[in-house]
């Protein structure tokens, strides 16, 4: 199933043809943002989801061959995503939504650093670092968006790049403040039933109840 979802995206993006071939349908309730946010949302969330799977070692099984193929496509796709001359250069510098979806890309690097970040060439790495740092232009509201900002800064720290520790600490402190019990966190001051806790929290030996 993961391969069936990922292959159409990565096979096209690896050739710089995702925007050309991806069919985008707009909801009747679309809020008017640029449709180009769709491509980063698609790529970022896909890669964050399959990164742990792609981090598994290669083997000669059918699944192993699929992972290897996806990983090869993914590395080429990552390069297109930050290459200003590529048709698949993503929407990094407009709108506010890129803060959210770039965090998923950063998450994919954190989840499979050796497989998805380290093999990238130095030019591509520096482009990612620059794009991530430029997202500081976005002042996140006091909601779960603080966590997206912190995810990006956490990756920059992991990559030995200049990072903003205040953004990380602020997100962690606000998340602790917004804990409402029984494993749930509010989305800012307003409680909401959503899945963010599954994305941003993990079991901790120090606090099993909140995890």
For the regions a language model picked out, list residue spans one by one:
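Secondary-structure boundary/capping residues
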Residues: 184, 210-211
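Ser/Thr/Asn(+Pro)-rich, low-complexity disordered segments
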Residues: 1-199
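Conserved small/polar residues in nucleotide/adenosyl-binding loops
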Residues: 200-209
């Amino acid at each position: 199933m993961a391969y069936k979802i990922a292959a159409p995206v990565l096979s096209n993006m690896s050739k710089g043809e995702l925007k050309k071939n991806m069919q985008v349908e707009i909801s009747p309730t679309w809020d008017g943002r640029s449709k180009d946010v769709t491509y980063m949302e698609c790529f970022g969330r896909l890669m964050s989801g399959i990164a742990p799977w792609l981090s598994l070692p290669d083997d000669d099984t059918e699944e192993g061959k699929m992972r290897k193929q996806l990983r090869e496509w993914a590395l080429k796709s990552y390069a297109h995503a930050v290459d200003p001359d590529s048709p698949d250069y993503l929407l990094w510098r407009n709108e506010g939504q890129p803060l959210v979806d770039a965090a998923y890309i950063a998450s994919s690097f954190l989840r499979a650093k050796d497989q998805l970040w380290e093999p990238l060439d130095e030019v591509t790495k520096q482009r990612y670092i620059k794009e991530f740092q430029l997202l500081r232009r976005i002042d996140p509201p006091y909601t779960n968006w603080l966590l997206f900002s912190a995810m990006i800064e956490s990756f920059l720290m992991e990559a030995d790049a200049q990072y903003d520790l205040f953004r990380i600490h602020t997100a962690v402190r606000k998340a602790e403040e917004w804990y409402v019990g029984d494993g749930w966190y509010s989305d800012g001051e307003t409680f909401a039933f959503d899945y963010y806790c599954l994305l941003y929290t993990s079991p901790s030996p120090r606090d099993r109840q909140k995890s």
